[in-house]
Amino acid sequence: MTKTLPKDFIFGGATAAYQAEGATHTDGKGPVAWDKYLEDNYWYTAEPASDFYNRYPVDLKLAEEYGVNGIRISIAWSRIFPTGYGQVNAKGVEFYHNLFAECHKRHVEPFVTLHHFDTPEALHSNGDFLNRENIEHFVDYAAFCFEEFPEVNYWTTFNEIGPIGDGQYLVGKFPPGIQYDLAKVFQSHHNMMVSHARAVKLYKDKGYKGEIGVVHALPTKYPLDHENPADVRAAELEDIIHNKFILDATYLGRYSAETMEGVNHILSVNGGSLDLREEDFTALEAAKDLNDFLGINYYMSDWMEAFDGETEIIHNGKGKKGSSKYQIKGVGRRVAPDYVPRTDWDWIIYPQGLYDQIMRVKKDYPNYKKIYITENGLGYKDEFVDNTVYDDGRIDYVKQHLEILSDAIADGANVKGYFIWSLMDVFSWSNGYEKRYGLFYVDFETQERYPKKSAHWYKKVAETQIID
């Protein structure tokens, strides 16, 4: 049976400042930690990315032509405050006013994120969100943006608090490149959630007319053997690290006893302690019912089995299937069942996981209000032929996930929109330029845009709301 989506459903495309804009040192933009980190550790940089800084009118015209009526954009903090605080960079402010005006001209609603992995270098080198001063700087930055950009109707505080902590302190593929420090992971998550809560409370106290929420990456975690209590426990602990800790902070305003028991177990095995203060929980409690929406970024699920041994994580950054490894001492090991397909980067393709995660939020956090799927898509080594890409695999991937959303809505979940990652091809943090996600192919040499087969398909779905 052909499935449909509601008439008011947003069919969006997602971007991020550092992955799309280029112009990393242009017009007074301050440095971010990624600038030097990429030069020192990778075979690519964020120049020119998709040159969105100059070519956003082209991308927004394409969005309008192809039925994309929402766009995720992030503001580069260091374009507004080059050192994270203090002096405002007027040219950066002007750029975003112009960008948002173009969005509205093209009838593409901007959903604007304040922080998408790109803390200014001056703050990052001073501990990033492990340093509590950063909470104050972030709230000041948020306050400035809320006041300066009244044309923005949808605000997101952070993109993917979970993967930031994981990337910086667990996997070690984000600057500062620290591995296996679970205490820093949880402390980073916590301090960023406090920052989120304080920004949300400020937004509501000021009476701004728009909406505000947060974007969490929520990869669903399953036990490899549902009958094995040790595997079930491994999945529960892995879920606490990546999902439950931050969801509790968002919607409970505290960490449940079950969550803290898991956190304490993980830290007892791996070392370290947390600094959780009374005023933190006052802030979390004050914001827990103020989130207008939850953004869910969903790409994959994981299966966990019990594991006794040392932590080892190997990141597959070059698309060599089967080269990744993930096992955490005292938690478990990721082992995918043979029947589940995966990408060349070992990302597990499992649309049912999205349904299960949405229903988990609905059940466990009934004060969630509404959900947008703020990222979902397929990274591919696209073959560019005949000025296009015949990306049937991407179409199939997106189709399956949209059908899941139709099911979730039918079963009572309030899902209001979907943003494909990504609108056009962008640079990928730890994979460079080979891993493409866009509806529009970008020739990174010429910066020309070419609609892929998926763009034509997405346009039809957006126009008809029929998933075909």
Swiss-Prot record:
Active site (record annotation): E160 (proton donor), E375 (nucleophile)
PROSITE patterns with a match to the protein in the record: GLYCOSYL_HYDROL_F1_1, GLYCOSYL_HYDROL_F1_2
Single GO biological process annotation from the record: lactose catabolic process via tagatose-6-phosphate
Matching InterPro entries: 6P-beta-galactosidase (IPR005928), Glyco_hydro_1 (IPR001360), Glyco_hydro_1_AS (IPR018120), Glyco_hydro_1_N_CS (IPR033132), Glycoside_hydrolase_SF (IPR017853)
UniProt binding sites for D-galactose 6-phosphate: Q19, H116, N159, E160, N297, S428, W429, K435, Y437
Gene Ontology molecular function, alphabetical: 6-phospho-beta-galactosidase activity; beta-glucosidase activity
Reactions catalysed, as given in the entry: a 6-phospho-beta-D-galactoside + H2O = D-galactose 6-phosphate + an alcohol
Involved pathway(s): Carbohydrate metabolism; lactose degradation; D-galactose 6-phosphate and beta-D-glucose from lactose 6-phosphate: step 1/1
PANTHER family: GLYCOSYL HYDROLASE, LP05116P
Family in the record: Belongs to the glycosyl hydrolase 1 family.
HAMAP family linked: LacG
Protein name as catalogued: 6-phospho-beta-galactosidase 2
